[in-house]
Amino acid sequence: MARDEVRRILPADIKREVLIKDENAETNPDWGFPPEKRPIEMHIQFGVINLDKPPGPTSHEVVAWIKKILNLEKAGHGGTLDPKVSGVLPVALEKATRVVQALLPAGKEYVALMHLHGDVPEDKIIQVMKEFEGEIIQRPPLRSAVKRRLRTRKVYYIEVLEIEGRDVLFRVGVEAGTYIRSLIHHIGLALGVGAHMSELRRTRSGPFKEDETLITLHDLVDYYYFWKEDGIEEYFRKAIQPMEKAVEHLPKVWIKDSAVAAVTHGADLAVPGIAKLHAGIKRGDLVAIMTLKDELVALGKAMMTSQEMLEKTKGIAVDVEKVFMPRDWYPKLWEKRDRS
Protein backbone atom coordinates (compact mmCIF):
# COMPACT_ATOMS: atom_id res chain seq x y z
CA MET A 1 0.00 0.00 0.00
CA ALA A 2 1.17 3.60 -0.56
CA ARG A 3 2.78 5.28 2.39
CA ASP A 4 2.47 8.97 3.26
CA GLU A 5 5.79 10.80 2.97
CA VAL A 6 7.26 11.51 6.40
CA ARG A 7 9.27 14.65 7.18
CA ARG A 8 12.33 13.21 8.90
CA ILE A 9 13.48 16.17 10.99
CA LEU A 10 15.75 15.84 14.04
CA PRO A 11 16.91 18.73 16.26
CA ALA A 12 20.23 18.49 14.37
CA ASP A 13 18.43 19.58 11.18
CA ILE A 14 17.30 22.99 12.46
CA LYS A 15 18.54 25.84 10.25
CA ARG A 16 19.71 28.94 12.10
CA GLU A 17 20.10 32.55 11.02
CA VAL A 18 23.49 34.22 11.60
CA LEU A 19 23.42 37.67 13.24
CA ILE A 20 26.38 40.03 12.79
CA LYS A 21 27.47 41.94 15.92
CA ASP A 22 30.79 43.37 14.66
CA GLU A 23 30.96 43.65 10.87
CA ASN A 24 34.59 44.82 11.06
CA ALA A 25 35.85 41.70 12.84
CA GLU A 26 38.59 39.90 10.91
CA THR A 27 40.83 36.92 11.62
CA ASN A 28 44.59 36.63 11.25
CA PRO A 29 45.43 33.76 8.85
CA ASP A 30 48.70 33.13 10.71
CA TRP A 31 46.93 32.08 13.91
CA GLY A 32 45.14 28.84 14.68
CA PHE A 33 44.64 25.61 12.75
CA PRO A 34 41.43 25.46 10.68
CA PRO A 35 40.12 21.87 10.36
CA GLU A 36 41.14 21.52 6.71
CA LYS A 37 44.73 22.66 7.40
CA ARG A 38 45.63 20.52 10.42
CA PRO A 39 48.62 18.17 10.05
CA ILE A 40 47.53 14.53 10.17
CA GLU A 41 48.85 13.98 13.72
CA MET A 42 46.87 17.01 14.93
CA HIS A 43 43.85 15.86 12.90
CA ILE A 44 43.86 12.63 14.91
CA GLN A 45 44.21 14.45 18.25
CA PHE A 46 41.15 16.59 17.49
CA GLY A 47 39.16 14.05 15.46
CA VAL A 48 35.98 11.98 15.52
CA ILE A 49 35.40 8.70 13.68
CA ASN A 50 31.94 8.01 12.24
CA LEU A 51 32.14 4.28 12.88
CA ASP A 52 29.83 1.61 11.50
CA LYS A 53 29.66 -0.61 14.58
CA PRO A 54 29.24 -4.29 13.73
CA PRO A 55 26.78 -6.50 15.64
CA GLY A 56 28.50 -8.54 18.34
CA PRO A 57 30.90 -6.44 20.41
CA THR A 58 29.87 -3.87 23.00
CA SER A 59 30.40 -0.18 22.28
CA HIS A 60 33.08 -0.15 24.98
CA GLU A 61 34.95 -3.01 23.29
CA VAL A 62 34.85 -1.23 19.93
CA VAL A 63 36.33 1.93 21.46
CA ALA A 64 39.05 -0.16 23.14
CA TRP A 65 39.92 -1.72 19.77
CA ILE A 66 40.19 1.70 18.14
CA LYS A 67 42.50 2.92 20.91
CA LYS A 68 44.69 -0.14 20.39
CA ILE A 69 44.67 0.09 16.57
CA LEU A 70 45.56 3.79 16.53
CA ASN A 71 47.78 3.67 19.64
CA LEU A 72 45.69 6.27 21.48
CA GLU A 73 45.43 7.11 25.16
CA LYS A 74 41.84 8.37 25.15
CA ALA A 75 38.66 7.86 23.13
CA GLY A 76 34.95 7.98 23.86
CA HIS A 77 31.74 7.12 22.04
CA GLY A 78 28.60 9.17 21.50
CA GLY A 79 25.81 6.94 22.78
CA THR A 80 25.95 3.24 23.66
CA LEU A 81 24.72 0.64 21.19
CA ASP A 82 23.80 -2.80 22.59
CA PRO A 83 26.03 -5.66 21.39
CA LYS A 84 23.51 -6.98 18.84
CA VAL A 85 22.83 -3.51 17.42
CA SER A 86 24.83 -2.17 14.46
CA GLY A 87 25.25 1.24 12.88
CA VAL A 88 26.44 4.77 13.49
CA LEU A 89 28.71 5.10 16.54
CA PRO A 90 30.64 8.39 16.71
CA VAL A 91 33.99 7.83 18.43
CA ALA A 92 35.85 10.95 19.59
CA LEU A 93 39.63 10.73 19.87
CA GLU A 94 42.19 12.07 22.35
CA LYS A 95 41.69 15.80 22.98
CA ALA A 96 38.27 15.72 21.27
CA THR A 97 36.95 12.96 23.56
CA ARG A 98 34.62 15.21 25.58
CA VAL A 99 32.95 16.62 22.46
CA VAL A 100 30.52 13.67 22.48
CA GLN A 101 28.52 15.65 25.08
CA ALA A 102 27.46 17.90 22.22
CA LEU A 103 25.58 15.02 20.57
CA LEU A 104 23.04 14.63 23.39
CA PRO A 105 20.57 17.27 22.14
CA ALA A 106 21.03 16.32 18.46
CA GLY A 107 18.63 13.37 18.23
CA LYS A 108 19.15 9.85 16.90
CA GLU A 109 17.59 7.77 14.14
CA TYR A 110 17.12 4.00 13.92
CA VAL A 111 15.76 1.44 11.49
CA ALA A 112 14.06 -1.38 13.39
CA LEU A 113 12.39 -4.67 12.55
CA MET A 114 9.38 -5.33 14.78
CA HIS A 115 7.73 -8.75 14.93
CA LEU A 116 4.07 -8.77 15.95
CA HIS A 117 2.68 -11.69 17.95
CA GLY A 118 -0.61 -11.66 16.07
CA ASP A 119 -2.18 -10.56 12.80
CA VAL A 120 -3.11 -6.87 12.50
CA PRO A 121 -4.42 -4.97 9.41
CA GLU A 122 -1.75 -2.77 7.81
CA ASP A 123 -3.74 0.45 8.12
CA LYS A 124 -4.20 -0.14 11.87
CA ILE A 125 -0.47 -0.78 12.32
CA ILE A 126 0.40 2.52 10.62
CA GLN A 127 -2.30 4.45 12.49
CA VAL A 128 -1.28 3.16 15.93
CA MET A 129 2.44 3.65 15.31
CA LYS A 130 1.87 7.29 14.30
CA GLU A 131 0.17 7.84 17.65
CA PHE A 132 3.55 7.26 19.33
CA GLU A 133 5.01 10.42 17.78
CA GLY A 134 5.52 13.18 20.35
CA GLU A 135 6.32 12.77 24.05
CA ILE A 136 6.20 9.26 25.50
CA ILE A 137 6.92 7.85 28.96
CA GLN A 138 9.39 4.99 29.23
CA ARG A 139 10.99 2.80 31.86
CA PRO A 140 14.44 1.44 30.89
CA PRO A 141 14.50 -2.31 30.08
CA LEU A 142 15.53 -4.82 32.76
CA ARG A 143 18.88 -5.39 31.03
CA SER A 144 19.67 -1.66 31.04
CA ALA A 145 22.61 -0.35 33.07
CA VAL A 146 20.67 2.70 34.30
CA LYS A 147 18.13 2.91 37.13
CA ARG A 148 14.65 1.88 36.01
CA ARG A 149 12.87 5.17 36.72
CA LEU A 150 10.05 6.43 34.53
CA ARG A 151 11.30 9.09 32.12
CA THR A 152 9.87 11.26 29.36
CA ARG A 153 11.37 11.00 25.88
CA LYS A 154 10.42 12.52 22.53
CA VAL A 155 9.71 10.60 19.33
CA TYR A 156 10.24 13.04 16.44
CA TYR A 157 8.89 10.81 13.67
CA ILE A 158 7.95 7.23 12.81
CA GLU A 159 7.95 6.04 9.21
CA VAL A 160 6.71 2.56 8.28
CA LEU A 161 8.94 1.29 5.48
CA GLU A 162 7.59 -2.19 4.84
CA ILE A 163 5.07 -4.65 6.26
CA GLU A 164 5.34 -8.34 5.47
CA GLY A 165 2.97 -10.51 7.46
CA ARG A 166 3.78 -9.94 11.11
CA ASP A 167 7.11 -8.23 10.41
CA VAL A 168 7.16 -4.42 10.34
CA LEU A 169 10.24 -2.52 9.16
CA PHE A 170 10.20 1.11 10.29
CA ARG A 171 12.41 4.17 10.70
CA VAL A 172 12.19 6.25 13.87
CA GLY A 173 13.80 9.52 15.00
CA VAL A 174 14.07 9.94 18.75
CA GLU A 175 15.57 11.93 21.59
CA ALA A 176 18.80 10.56 23.09
CA GLY A 177 18.09 7.97 25.77
CA THR A 178 14.99 6.52 24.08
CA TYR A 179 14.80 2.71 24.24
CA ILE A 180 13.58 1.31 20.94
CA ARG A 181 13.02 -2.13 22.46
CA SER A 182 10.62 -0.60 25.00
CA LEU A 183 8.95 1.49 22.28
CA ILE A 184 8.27 -1.65 20.25
CA HIS A 185 6.93 -3.45 23.33
CA HIS A 186 4.43 -0.65 23.94
CA ILE A 187 3.42 -0.51 20.27
CA GLY A 188 2.64 -4.22 20.54
CA LEU A 189 0.51 -3.61 23.62
CA ALA A 190 -1.35 -0.78 21.86
CA LEU A 191 -2.06 -3.08 18.91
CA GLY A 192 -3.43 -5.69 21.31
CA VAL A 193 -1.20 -8.53 20.11
CA GLY A 194 2.22 -7.91 21.65
CA ALA A 195 5.50 -7.40 19.79
CA HIS A 196 9.24 -7.72 20.13
CA MET A 197 12.29 -6.25 18.39
CA SER A 198 13.98 -8.59 15.92
CA GLU A 199 16.72 -6.30 14.60
CA LEU A 200 17.96 -2.75 15.14
CA ARG A 201 20.39 -0.45 13.36
CA ARG A 202 21.26 3.16 14.19
CA THR A 203 21.31 5.27 11.03
CA ARG A 204 21.99 8.70 12.56
CA SER A 205 23.49 10.29 15.63
CA GLY A 206 22.92 14.01 15.12
CA PRO A 207 25.24 15.20 12.33
CA PHE A 208 26.76 11.71 11.88
CA LYS A 209 24.90 9.69 9.26
CA GLU A 210 25.11 6.74 6.92
CA ASP A 211 27.06 8.68 4.30
CA GLU A 212 30.54 8.73 2.77
CA THR A 213 32.10 9.45 6.19
CA LEU A 214 30.84 6.17 7.73
CA ILE A 215 33.64 3.59 7.96
CA THR A 216 34.09 0.06 9.29
CA LEU A 217 36.79 -1.18 11.65
CA HIS A 218 38.34 -3.05 8.70
CA ASP A 219 38.52 0.21 6.72
CA LEU A 220 40.15 1.94 9.66
CA VAL A 221 42.84 -0.73 10.00
CA ASP A 222 43.59 -0.60 6.27
CA TYR A 223 43.75 3.20 6.09
CA TYR A 224 45.96 3.40 9.18
CA TYR A 225 48.30 0.83 7.62
CA PHE A 226 48.47 2.78 4.33
CA TRP A 227 49.49 5.87 6.28
CA LYS A 228 51.98 4.26 8.67
CA GLU A 229 53.61 1.81 6.26
CA ASP A 230 53.24 3.47 2.85
CA GLY A 231 53.03 7.14 3.80
CA ILE A 232 49.61 7.53 2.12
CA GLU A 233 47.54 9.71 4.45
CA GLU A 234 44.64 10.58 2.11
CA TYR A 235 42.36 7.69 3.11
CA PHE A 236 43.17 7.85 6.81
CA ARG A 237 42.53 11.60 6.87
CA LYS A 238 39.09 11.06 5.29
CA ALA A 239 38.33 8.34 7.85
CA ILE A 240 38.58 10.89 10.68
CA GLN A 241 36.27 13.89 10.87
CA PRO A 242 37.33 17.12 12.60
CA MET A 243 35.79 17.60 16.04
CA GLU A 244 33.88 20.55 14.59
CA LYS A 245 31.63 18.00 12.83
CA ALA A 246 30.24 17.01 16.23
CA VAL A 247 28.97 20.55 16.92
CA GLU A 248 27.47 21.31 13.48
CA HIS A 249 23.97 21.20 14.96
CA LEU A 250 24.60 23.43 17.98
CA PRO A 251 23.82 27.15 18.15
CA LYS A 252 27.12 28.98 17.78
CA VAL A 253 28.84 32.16 18.90
CA TRP A 254 31.83 33.23 16.77
CA ILE A 255 34.45 35.25 18.63
CA LYS A 256 37.14 37.74 17.70
CA ASP A 257 40.78 36.68 17.60
CA SER A 258 41.38 38.94 20.60
CA ALA A 259 39.01 36.85 22.75
CA VAL A 260 40.26 33.36 21.85
CA ALA A 261 43.25 33.09 24.19
CA ALA A 262 41.24 34.44 27.14
CA VAL A 263 38.66 31.67 26.69
CA THR A 264 41.32 28.97 26.29
CA HIS A 265 42.93 30.19 29.53
CA GLY A 266 39.69 29.73 31.47
CA ALA A 267 37.77 32.99 31.10
CA ASP A 268 34.04 33.01 30.39
CA LEU A 269 33.00 34.67 27.14
CA ALA A 270 32.18 38.36 27.58
CA VAL A 271 29.97 40.27 25.15
CA PRO A 272 32.76 42.49 23.68
CA GLY A 273 34.50 39.38 22.33
CA ILE A 274 31.57 38.36 20.08
CA ALA A 275 31.79 38.92 16.31
CA LYS A 276 28.61 37.09 15.22
CA LEU A 277 26.12 34.57 16.57
CA HIS A 278 23.16 32.39 15.74
CA ALA A 279 19.65 33.71 16.23
CA GLY A 280 17.33 31.87 18.61
CA ILE A 281 19.78 31.21 21.44
CA LYS A 282 17.99 30.94 24.80
CA ARG A 283 19.46 31.24 28.28
CA GLY A 284 20.72 27.84 29.39
CA ASP A 285 21.29 26.52 25.85
CA LEU A 286 24.42 24.52 25.13
CA VAL A 287 26.39 26.61 22.62
CA ALA A 288 29.61 26.14 20.67
CA ILE A 289 32.15 28.95 20.81
CA MET A 290 33.93 29.18 17.44
CA THR A 291 36.71 31.27 15.91
CA LEU A 292 36.13 33.18 12.69
CA LYS A 293 37.98 30.31 10.96
CA ASP A 294 35.30 27.90 12.25
CA GLU A 295 37.61 26.26 14.78
CA LEU A 296 35.92 24.92 17.93
CA VAL A 297 37.21 26.80 20.98
CA ALA A 298 34.86 25.61 23.72
CA LEU A 299 31.37 24.51 24.74
CA GLY A 300 29.39 26.49 27.26
CA LYS A 301 26.01 27.51 28.65
CA ALA A 302 24.37 30.64 27.26
CA MET A 303 23.87 33.27 29.96
CA MET A 304 22.03 35.60 27.57
CA THR A 305 19.59 35.28 24.68
CA SER A 306 20.75 36.03 21.14
CA GLN A 307 19.06 39.41 21.29
CA GLU A 308 20.77 40.31 24.57
CA MET A 309 24.18 39.30 23.16
CA LEU A 310 23.50 41.45 20.12
CA GLU A 311 22.33 44.55 22.00
CA LYS A 312 24.47 44.60 25.16
CA THR A 313 27.99 46.03 25.35
CA LYS A 314 29.18 44.20 28.46
CA GLY A 315 28.46 41.19 30.64
CA ILE A 316 29.07 37.43 30.43
CA ALA A 317 27.41 35.93 27.38
CA VAL A 318 28.53 32.29 27.75
CA ASP A 319 29.59 30.36 30.85
CA VAL A 320 32.44 28.24 29.45
CA GLU A 321 32.23 24.58 30.53
CA LYS A 322 34.66 22.65 28.30
CA VAL A 323 37.65 24.06 26.41
CA PHE A 324 38.96 22.12 23.40
CA MET A 325 41.42 24.49 21.77
CA PRO A 326 45.03 24.45 23.05
CA ARG A 327 46.21 27.64 24.72
CA ASP A 328 49.04 28.25 22.26
CA TRP A 329 47.00 28.41 19.02
CA TYR A 330 46.20 32.11 19.46
CA PRO A 331 48.39 34.78 21.14
CA LYS A 332 47.55 36.43 24.46
CA LEU A 333 46.51 39.76 23.03
CA TRP A 334 45.47 41.13 26.42
CA GLU A 335 49.14 41.03 27.50
CA LYS A 336 50.06 43.28 24.58
CA ARG A 337 47.33 45.72 25.61
CA ASP A 338 48.60 45.69 29.20
CA ARG A 339 52.15 46.54 28.11
CA SER A 340 51.12 49.30 25.71
From Swiss-Prot:
Enzyme class: isomerase
One Gene Ontology biological process: tRNA pseudouridine synthesis
Active site location: D82
Gene3D superfamilies with a match to the protein in the record: Pseudouridine synthase, PUA domain
Catalytic reaction annotation: uridine(55) in tRNA = pseudouridine(55) in tRNA
GO MF term list: RNA binding; tRNA pseudouridine(55) synthase activity
Signal peptide interval: none
PUA domain ranges (all copies): 250-325
Listed InterPro entries: Dyskerin-like, PsdUridine_synth_cat_dom_sf, PsdUridine_synth_N, PUA, PUA-like_sf, PUA_sf, tRNA_PsdUridine_synth_B_fam, TruB_arch
EC number annotated for this UniProt entry: 5.4.99.25
Keywords carried by this UniProt record: Isomerase, tRNA processing
UniProt cross-references to NCBIfam families, sorted A to Z: CBF5, PRK04270.1, unchar_dom_2
Job description of the protein: Could be responsible for synthesis of pseudouridine from uracil-55 in the psi GC loop of transfer RNAs.
Similarity section: Belongs to the pseudouridine synthase TruB family. Type 2 subfamily.
HAMAP family on file: TruB_arch (MF_01081)
Name assigned to this protein: Probable tRNA pseudouridine synthase B
Origin species: Pyrococcus furiosus (strain ATCC 43587 / DSM 3638 / JCM 8422 / Vc1)
